[in-house]
Amino acid sequence: MQKINGQDMKRHNVHLVINTIIKYGPISRTELRDRVGLTAATVINITNDLLERNILLQEGLAAASSKGRKALMLNVNPTAFYTLGVSLTTRRLRVGLANFQGQIVDHVDVTIRNTITPEEAVDLIQQNVQMLVEKHQVPTEKLVGVGVAAPGPLDTHTGLITVPPDLPNWRNVPLQKLLEERLQLPV
């Protein structure tokens, strides 16, 4: 059994809090504490840090359900981070931009042929990523990564598209590596 150090535990707790807020937000600290099973002090410390870093937002007060103060509602800041998604089929390339709440901000569809080469596809992906990022004025440091859906079979350990039956120019293509080098983002 592997030991977990304090930093790993803190990182785990922060991810747990963020993922819970993404799923259930807006949410009060009390409900958040109940859902994640951490102490009130830990939840307060984590959420205060995330508010200070502008990763979370305060979204008003909860409706009064009993006596006492209304609870402050927390949600993730949709513009704190962004992700990119790429879907490649034999007929279409789609590149999308999503915010931190998982909402699609925008996407671009490009009609392609199954004879497209990997180099042509990577060029198209880069052009459309750049267009979306510039159009929505997303700072590079807010881009956390790229998810890719492509015809298989795919070797998940090496990132190679091995022998897709409908893309004749795509035998043993290291798509993950090509995109990481070109986009300078995790894929």
Where are the regions a protein language model picked out?
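Gly/Thr-rich phosphate-binding beta-strand-loop-beta motif of the actin/hexokinase/Hsp70
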Residues: 70-107
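Glycine-rich phosphate-binding loop and adjoining helix at the ATP-binding site
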Residues: 108-187
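Beta-hairpin "wing" of winged helix-turn-helix
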Residues: 51-67
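Basic amphipathic alpha-helical segments that dock to polyanions
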Residues: 21, 32, 43, 47-56
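Extreme N-terminal segment that seeds HTH/winged-HTH DNA-binding domains in transcriptional regulators
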Residues: 1-35
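Canonical helix-turn-helix DNA-binding module
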Residues: 38-49, 66-68
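Short beta-strand(s) of the beta-wing in winged-helix/HTH DNA-binding folds
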Residues: 28, 57-58, 155
